[in-house]
Every structure is written in structure tokens, then in C-alpha cells.
């Protein structure tokens, strides 16, 4: 842009973690400016890691990602914020074409995705963490890979938000030591041609990765958490729940964790896109050719069994085996109304995506398919996610996940060792019942979001704002009206889409 200064600036999009602008120069050239929001993660690491990840994928693995022209990992610049200037890719999002694609085009796209993922799976990273350019990290916190790329601390926002940024927790990696210093070590060995001979790049072990979220949350809870009532939608309590209930479950998980580790290539450090949604895949206009994969913010390198799974756009139910039956539209599809056709087509396309992604992965990325075959992989990954959620007096899903994984019929497929954690039959039944209530509550809340056309955090498009506000007000009042006697105030107070400062009382029935 320097050749034609003072570009025209227009906002392209704004989400919870980024603001995206188009910069247009007088000569017609356009670039994308991406500015992270304060809640995106640690300012320096978030920007530096996203830039390095895109540069690595483009330069080393030759994958189609936007070219980075310039960036700043500090707000001490004329812009007053961290930023990334990158290529604007002239493509159509997969989301805009999703329901109009032919089956052959869906197959082609799934093959391309599987082949790109294979290139990433095939690269032998020496440790776990996030990618950076060498110049963007202190020398003590980096493991060299290739060219000027290094692995450094995990940039994921979960490890930095709130009190976590001030708490000593494992974020990885790393130290680099002479080979002679460590005759044996749990970790990955990386041979680097240097002036002093071979070195070992030591990152977090697989067990460190599996337990890091639990240990992180235990550290924060022990220092900062206080008893509080559960404020979950439709499942609130009018009594305090003590943080020790959370840490006790995390302690039980730490006993289980060593048995979840998979040997050899199953634990290989693997990079994966953090959110491969339809909107993050760009196609060449009018074709099924993928020309860019965007939004690599928060991408990390973790053990393969933690990274394996279906892309976000598949909405795959990991608790169920993938059907090998070729999906088809109902015989009376042409007689349906437009809205019903759209709903049926969306389900049909989802079934196609799951089937053909599975097939493409089996043919083009055998390493990934082998991991997907791990018994109860979905249950294990679900448990790992639950250990990373912050204290909010809601431990329903963490308890249910532990109960599920330690069920004898499940545990026997995971480990040949005796399960180190036991629950009584009464505890199991109570946990399952509570989890079912939670799921029913979440399904209702999902219908509320769909009705209001809002996202998980209550955000919506500007032209839907007034409608969503009024609809939200009416639904909140209706919920109180239908609440049991004595529950109206709790229901009103725990409505999920209200201002934090809203301390009002419910209207009288």
C-alpha cells in the first residue's frame, strides 16, 4: 500500500475475537487488515503465532493460505493496536455455496481437505506449543523447526484470560540442550544440523498436554475461586456450590489421565486448524477448487489423539459410528415447501460431508484415520475439553464425562489397567440424570437462539438487533410466567441473555 498511501478503509466483518477491514488504495489494490480484540488472547503471542502459522503453511507446506504483508505484535504503532495486513483472496466462502453444490463437488472438496491435512500430519514437529518466527520470541522460549520458524508457548486464549495471565502454569514448550546431557528423555528428539552438533528439543510431554488444562484450572481455582450458586439456564441453585467440588473432580481426572495417553505416532505433535468452518474455506468462483483456508488464530501443536476429529462444518456426533450408507433426498422432496426443502437439504448435505470426509481421510490421510479408530476417542476428547472450563459452579458435564469414561464397559476398551477412580451406582445414576437435564436445558436454549437469530454469546447482525431485543424480552417474561411458584426470581435472574448490570425483579404475574 506504500506506493499509493491513504487507502479507503471499510469494515468487512467483526466478531468476538477480531475486527476485519478492507484497505483500498487509489490504484485499486486491496488488502485485509485484521485487528484482534482484547479478549482474543495475549496480544503479542496471539498475533505473532497467527502470522507464523500462516507463513509456515504457505512457505514450507505450500498450502493455500493468505500471504502476510506486514504485522505488528504491539499496540505501540500509529494504528494503536496489534494488526495483520494480509492478502485479500478473491473467493467464495464454502458457506455461500454449501447447499447448491453437487455431490461430486462435495466429494472433490473433501478430498482436497484430506490431502491438505495429510501434508500437515506428515510434517514432524519436534514439540508441542504454538508456531512463531524466531525474532518474535525470547530465545529461552523457542524450539527451532526449519528456516526461522520455532515452537514456543501455547497462544490459545484459554491459557491467558483473566487470572491465568498472572498464574504460573504450563504453556509450553521448551528448552534446548546438548544431546549428551540427556541420555534418555520422555519427549521427542529432533536432530538439527548446527555448528555444535545434535540437540534435543524438549517440549511438553503428551501427559503434560493432556493434564495442562486441569492443572491450569486447579491453580486458578485454588487462588481465586469462591463459593457461588450455579447459574446455569433452567438448572440454577439457590445455594452455594464450593470450588472444592470442582477441584475434586479435576483430581480424579488427573488419576485417569495417564491411561488416556496413546503411544508412538498417536502422540505425534500435530498442527490442526482450530475452527475449520464453512466460512473459513474459500473456493475459486464457480468451482469446487479450494483457493484459501483462513482464520488460523489460536492454532496449536498438540498430541495427535487430541487433535484428531472431523472439521467443524461436519457437526459430527463422535459418540456414533459413521454410517457408510450413501444419503439421499426423500422421494417427495420436490413437493415440499421451500423452507422444508432447505431444512432437508441441510441435513442431507451434512450426511454427505460426514460420509465423504471419512472416505477421503481413509484414502488420503491414513495416519488420521488410524487415530479416528481409537475406541471411545470422542468421549476422551469430550472429557479433556470439560477439564478446561473455568469455575462457574457448574460441574455437571465434567462429572458426567468422568462417570462415562470410567464405566467398566468403556474403560476396558481404553486401558487394560484397573480404573483408578470409582463411582457408586447411585453416584453414576445421579450424574447421568443431571447430565440429561442439562442437555434438555441446552436444547431449549439452542431453540431460543435459533428463534432470536443470535449466536452463543447473544450477538446478532445489526439489522436483526431490534427484533432480537424485543423477542428476548418476551421470552424472558414468558419463562417467568411458566416457572413454578418460588422459582420466578431465580429464573429471571439467571436468564442468559441479559445485561450483567440487570438486577431488576421479575414482573408480577
Swiss-Prot record:
Kindly give the InterPro entries that the UniProt entry links to this protein. Answer: Aminoglycoside_PTrfase, Kinase-like_dom_sf, Mito_inheritance_9
Instruction: Supply the induction statement.
Output: Expression is regulated by the hypoxia responsive morphology factor A (hrmA).
**SUPFAM superfamilies with a match to the protein in the record:** Protein kinase-like (PK-like)
Q: Reply yes or no: does the keyword Transit peptide apply.
A: no
From what superkingdom does this record's organism come?
Eukaryota
> Could you mention a single GO BP entry for this protein?
cell adhesion
The entry's cellular-component GO terms read:
mitochondrion
Q: Which Gene3D superfamilies would you find in this protein's record? A: 3.90.1200.10, Phosphorylase Kinase, domain 1
Q: Name one Pfam family in it.
A: APH
Alphabetically sorted, this entry's keywords are: Cell adhesion, Virulence
Keyword check for Ligase: no
What is known about what this protein does? Part of the subtelomeric hrmA-associated cluster (HAC) containing genes that alter the hyphal surface (such as reduced total chitin or increased beta-glucan exposure) and perturb inter-hyphal interactions within the developing biofilms, resulting in a loss of vertically aligned polarized growing filaments. Consequently, this hypoxia-typic morphotype (called H-MORPH) with altered biofilm architecture leads to increased hypoxia fitness, increased host inflammation, rapid disease progression, and mortality in a murine model of invasive aspergillosis.
How is this protein named in the record?
A: Subtelomeric hrmA-associated cluster protein AFUB_078990
